[in-house]
């Protein structure tokens, strides 16, 4: 069985397998969450067919069909070894054209229940873009407070939570670029959209600037965050230092530290810059961290309106206190 539906229906389906048939490079740039890449054309083939198409469309289609047949043969073998005939399979390509149709027809003939995404990945991106461009029907409860007061640690303990730093693969400050390569903007938005679709219409979230490393939060999303219920988190300096040391000490390299200090150099004195670099070289971790916290505390702007204050020295205790405060909302949605 083979059908084709709009994304609004496609996202409601419960697929045993979701296939992205675009080239590996396209897939890595961004894809539907949960999709596997069974490409119709690999990167080199896709580029070759594109160049031929500009000169001879008939030849491009013939050459492309040949490549698709070769690649599909390998993919079909892997799919039938890992999934039962009769299971539901979702499939999409770039615009809902030949690449997805060719593999979809074969899987359907084998007995899989195949659903194609009408308009392909382009239709999905249009849907996601419009979703974030419009007023978001979502309530946020925002954890704010000074650096390293346990906001992220608390967030990871909460139900109905969106961890923006995790999705962006960045810790959010000038020193936050220690986790490796960030996703593309499209991949970030795909993951954020997926997170929001799997929650009720509210979420706990950490206060962030609009820019997290190279990622930019969608404007309507950011504006909604700014208007959210504010939970001000605070804890002792001792615990803040411990948390910073736990997160950064193993991941921070000498070169990366120099680069991070360079980012804040326009805002600090030459003496402070030298103190930071020497502190790292001498491994005077606690003194170094306290110095950095003093810098960040001066730059932090406390919200004008705070709806709840929360001591986060003990994260589990803070979690229970917070959940107790929101028990009515959580009970309404049967969330524990």
Question: Language-model features: where?
Answer:
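Phosphate-binding P-loop
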Residues: 83, 131-138
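Conserved nucleotide-sensing/catalytic segment adjacent to the nucleotide-binding pocket
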Residues: 159-224
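Short, polar loop motifs at secondary-structure junctions
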Residues: 21-26, 148-150, 166
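Catalytic cysteine-centered active loop of the rhodanese-like fold, especially the PTP/DSP P-loop
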Residues: 60-118
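Glycine-rich phosphate-binding P-loop
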Residues: 99, 139-159
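Conserved NTP phosphate-binding and transfer environment spanning the P-loop NTPase/kinase superfamily
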Residues: 224-230, 234-336
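Positively charged, proline/Ser/Thr-rich regional signature most characteristic
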Residues: 12-83
């Amino acid at each position: 069985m083979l059908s084709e539906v709009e994304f609004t229906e496609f996202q409601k389906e419960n697929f045993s397998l979701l296939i992205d048939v675009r080239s590996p490079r396209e897939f890595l740039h961004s894809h539907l969450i949960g999709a596997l890449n069974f490409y119709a054309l690999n990167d080199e083939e896709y580029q070759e067919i594109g160049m031929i198409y500009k000169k001879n469309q008939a030849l491009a289609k013939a050459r492309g069909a040949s490549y698709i047949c070769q690649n599909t043969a390998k993919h079909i073998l892997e799919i039938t070894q890992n999934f039962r005939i009769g299971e539901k399979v979702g499939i999409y390509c770039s615009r809902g054209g030949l690449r997805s149709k060719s593999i979809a027809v074969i899987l359907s003939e084998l007995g899989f229940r195949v659903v194609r995404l009408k308009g392909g990945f382009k239709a999905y991106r249009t849907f996601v873009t419009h979703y974030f461009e419009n007023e978001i029907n979502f309530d946020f409860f925002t954890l704010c407070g000074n650096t390293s007061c346990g906001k992220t640690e608390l967030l990871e303990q909460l139900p109905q939570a969106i961890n923006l730093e995790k999705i962006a693969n960045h810790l959010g400050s000038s020193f936050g670029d220690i986790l490796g390569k960030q996703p593309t903007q499209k991949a970030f938005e795909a993951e954020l959209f997926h997170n929001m679709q799997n929650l009720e219409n509210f979420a706990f979230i950490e206060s962030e600037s609009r820019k997290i490393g190279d990622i930019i939060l969608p404007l309507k999303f950011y504006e909604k965050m700014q208007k959210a219920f504010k939970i001000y988190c605070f804890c002792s300096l001792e615990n803040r230092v411990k948390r910073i040391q736990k997160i950064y000490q193993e991941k921070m390299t000498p070169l990366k530290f120099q680069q991070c200090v360079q980012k804040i150099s326009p805002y600090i004195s030459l003496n402070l810059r030298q103190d930071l670099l020497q502190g790292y070289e001498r491994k005077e971790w606690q003194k170094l961290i306290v110095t950095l916290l003093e810098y960040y505390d001066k730059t932090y702007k406390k919200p004008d309106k705070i709806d709840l204050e929360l001591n986060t020295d003990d994260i589990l205790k803070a979690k229970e206190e917070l959940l107790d405060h929101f028990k009515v909302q959580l009970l309404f949605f049967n969330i524990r």
